[in-house]
Design a protein with these regions (language model features):
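Select subsegments of transmembrane alpha-helices in polytopic membrane proteins
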Residues: 25-33, 97-104, 167-176, 243-248
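Helix-coil boundary and interhelical linker segments in multi-pass alpha-helical membrane proteins
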Residues: 38-66, 110-134, 181-214, 261, ...
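Alpha-helical transmembrane segments of polytopic integral membrane proteins
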Residues: 37-40, 70, 74, 108, ...
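C-terminal ends of transmembrane helices
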Residues: 79-90, 144-161, 168, 227-236
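Multi-pass membrane catalytic core of lipid/isoprenoid biosynthesis enzymes
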Residues: 27, 59, 66, 84-147
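C-terminal membrane-associated helical module and adjoining short loops/tails
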Residues: 1-13, 158, 163-307
Length: 307
């Protein structure tokens, strides 16, 4: 005759099963940390190989960019798995933030420096060597601030709007754009040949110095977007049942096939589109607000009676 279990008591086997479930998201976070560490090492080795073996440097920079891309994937999976299995914990949140500082803060800042603006010539009177240090550090600090703000908001009462949107550009998206750019053209900027473009009838020469300066501006802009109040879609509301299994399978198949065969084009498009969509939605909101204000002012203006 079996005995009823004591209320609140978990058998040893069930307790081990629950602990194993809590470990699954942390395994993905650990994979995120590994990818970030690998990206840092690859970027450093690529920087060292610039003067001796350009082909090896190109390969290492591309590997660093791919590692950041895999870190983005693991970061997306660990949170979703934790929510699906109801194993979200304070430990997991803190570990995830520390992993993100490495994979999406330090690694892309170092990669942008080593592959891009840290080795390009001075331009417009700007000492690129000094500016590169400042902008890479700015990116890292803004990324850390962004993660700290996210953790503070996560401890507050979560509304439906909070689940649908992020405040500021998420640091994985910023890192993903930097990695996508490097993956799209892994040859270091210092070694890229100059290109001539015709703009409004004038020939514009774009050399490595100009490319480095543009990359510097982009990283600075990403830093500002991370600590801004511009809202971005989180897609957390898109659960497993948001689409029919047929459409889910079709979209996933197209995405995997696109990344496999055309990873450079697909990834840079997705990363750029996500960064731009927040700015576009903010612009549309300001435009709608500007149209409403004159109308409301016109309605609220009192009509003076004739004496």
């Amino acid at each position: 005759m079996s005995e009823n279990p004591i209320p609140g008591y978990l058998p040893a086997e069930e307790g081990r099963r629950r602990r194993g479930a809590y470990a699954i998201p942390s395994l993905f976070t650990t994979a995120n940390i590994f990818c970030g560490f690998y990206a840092v090492i690859a970027a450093l080795k690529g920087y060292q190989a610039l003067g001796t073996d350009l082909g090896e440097a190109t390969r290492l920079f591309d590997n660093a960019a791919k590692a950041i891309g895999f870190a983005v994937l693991f970061d997306a999976l660990d949170g979703r798995i934790a929510r699906m299995t109801k194993t979200t914990s304070d430990f997991g949140v803190e570990l995830d933030s520390l992993a993100d500082v490495l994979s999406f803060g330090l690694a892309p800042a170092l990669l942008a420096y080593a592959w891009g603006y840290g080795v390009t010539p001075d331009i417009y009177g700007l000492e690129m060597g000094k500016a590169a240090w400042v902008i890479s550090f700015l990116y890292l600090v803004c990324g850390a601030f962004r993660l700290a703000r996210f953790n503070v908001h996560a401890r507050r009462t979560v509304t439906a709007k909070d689940r649908r949107q992020f405040v500021g550009l998420p640091i994985p998206a910023a890192a993903g754009l930097i990695a996508a750019i490097v993956h799209f053209s892994p040859t270091p900027l210092l070694a890229q040949s100059a290109r001539s473009f015709e703009v409004w009838g004038n020939h514009v020469l774009v050399d490595s110095a100009v490319l480095g300066f543009l990359m510097l501006l982009l990283v600075a802009a990403l830093s500002g977007l991370m600590i801004s109040t511009i809202r971005y879609r989180s897609f957390k509301d898109l659960g497993v049942g948001a689409l029919s299994p047929r459409w889910t399978l079709l979209l996933l198949s197209l995405l995997v096939a696109g990344i496999y065969f055309y990873s450079q084009w697909v990834l840079i498009f997705l990363a750029s589109a996500y960064v731009v969509h927040g700015l576009a939605m903010k612009g549309l909101a300001l435009l709608r607000l500007g149209r409403k204000e004159p109308a409301s002012a016109e309605v609220s203006t009192p009509i003076k009676s004739e004496p």
